[in-house]
Amino acid sequence: MRPFTRETGLAVPLDRVNVDTDQIIPKQFLKRIERTGFGQFLFHDWRYLPDGSPNPEFVLNRPQYAGATILIAGRNFGSGSSREHAPWALSDYGFRAIIAPSFADIFYNNCFQNGLLPVVLPEEAVAELMRRAQEPGYRLTVDLERCVVEDDAGFRVDFAIDAFRRHRMLHGLDDIGLTLQYEDEIAAYEARRPAWLPTTPAR
């Protein structure tokens, strides 16, 4: 998993509340077996018109937000089903962090498992970021080492994050990576473990 320490990039405002996972990545695109390739389908029903052409009214299709890496969203982002494809699609599109007043619990947890940083800020702070992000070229910094969201024009807000999750993100550790930190200890245990102890049979 790619570590996250500090991200400075274009910020795009998605001023909608209760965005659910079916809106993030519609169910008809969930048949892939890889984690990559979902970015092209992100917010599909909003990004594209019925004839398949880009919807010029949707924020991600505006040229000023091309290459954005930080998404600013409304409260309860990621509600609905627990599909892990939602953070996959956001990451594959290029987002590294999402800022919102609140997130659905399962989506929030899935983000950390996939190297995507969800940042909870007060509603008034998110509203101010939405306003600032209307300006072309608006860039924002999300600093996980200092737990700060800031820009070059005086905006600065601290955010809270669980210490264990912060450690995992800073060092790019998923569940397998965490286990491999103890590879030597596991090998030493297996070497000294008596052969007569019961084992789980392989199938």
Curated annotation (Swiss-Prot):
GO terms for cellular component: 3-isopropylmalate dehydratase complex. Keywords: Amino-acid biosynthesis, Branched-chain amino acid biosynthesis, Leucine biosynthesis, Lyase. It catalyses: (2R,3S)-3-isopropylmalate = (2S)-2-isopropylmalate. Pathway: Amino-acid biosynthesis; L-leucine biosynthesis; L-leucine from 3-methyl-2-oxobutanoate: step 2/4. InterPro entries: 3-IsopropMal_deHydase_ssu, Aconitase/3IPM_dehydase_swvl, AconitaseA/IPMdHydase_ssu_swvl, IPMI_Swivel, LeuD. Signal peptide: none annotated. GO terms for molecular function: 3-isopropylmalate dehydratase activity. Its EC number is 4.2.1.33. Belongs to the LeuD family. LeuD type 1 subfamily. Catalyzes the isomerization between 2-isopropylmalate and 3-isopropylmalate, via the formation of 2-isopropylmaleate. HAMAP family: LeuD_type1. Heterodimer of LeuC and LeuD. This is 3-isopropylmalate dehydratase small subunit. It comes from Symbiobacterium thermophilum (strain DSM 24528 / JCM 14929 / IAM 14863 / T). The lineage of its organism: Bacteria, Bacillati, Bacillota, Clostridia, Eubacteriales. The gene is leuD.
